[in-house]
Amino acid sequence: MKLDVKSVSAGYGGKLVLDGVDLTVPEGGILTLVGANGSGKSTLLKVIGRLLEPRAGEIVLDGRAIRSYGTTELARKMAILPQLHHAAGEITVGELVGYGRFPHRRGFGQLSADDRAVVDETLKLTRLEPFRNRPVGTLSGGERQRAWIAMTLAQQPRFLLLDEPTTFLDVRCQFDIIELVCDLNRRLGITVLMVLHDLNLAARCSDILVTLKERKIRHIGTPAEILRPEILRDIFGI
């Protein structure tokens, strides 16, 4: 399944943040967007995830413009976890993960046997079985982020979009989340597209790094190709 960004421009109000961006996301890998604050990383992720309408250009998923997909149809192929997300504190981890089954459910009834099986397997994959009946509000920051990632996985998407999944976490939890993402990519073959600020974390797990600056994509390559002094000076001024 192929994902292409074709000549996309996007912004907010009178401000243009992306200008004519083109990108092909390789299937089955981990691609990470990096760049300075305000470079358009999260904006590009939102456009791909259909949370923001582009001003020009289009996103093409599996040979079809993403705007042609119905909400449920798209949710079976792509899941996005924004940087900020909230749930009522009394909701249990198991219930939160069950919400991820919405594209596969009929109506608003109880989870089917198939749904429950997917929830069970997802809790195992994300090492959350012991927390199934714990209210989300009682979890640590790292545990809570794993629960949200588990909810997106319960959609059984082919593409997983993560906007700064390590934000507000301590160093240990940041590494735990990145290792979880790497493990899910290897086990499930799911394509991951994410935004990260930390270059060490990005280098640790990414197959491809994409740098953004001045509304454009500036570089695309492996971590070894991108994390070179001249490129870091260009993108970050360091």
Regions from the PLM with identified roles:
Residues L209-T222:
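H-loop (His-switch) and adjacent beta-strand-loop-beta switch element
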Residues Q110, P135-L139, E143:
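Conserved ABC ATPase signature
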Residues L160-E164:
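Catalytic Walker B motif of ABC-type/P-loop ATPase nucleotide-binding domains
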Residues G57-A65, L74:
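Conserved ABC transporter NBD signature motif
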Residues V34-A36:
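The feature captures the beta-strand-to-loop junction immediately N-terminal to the Walker
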Residues G98, A113-F131:
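Conserved ABC ATPase "signature" region
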Residues G49:
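Helix-to-loop junction immediately C-terminal to a conserved catalytic motif
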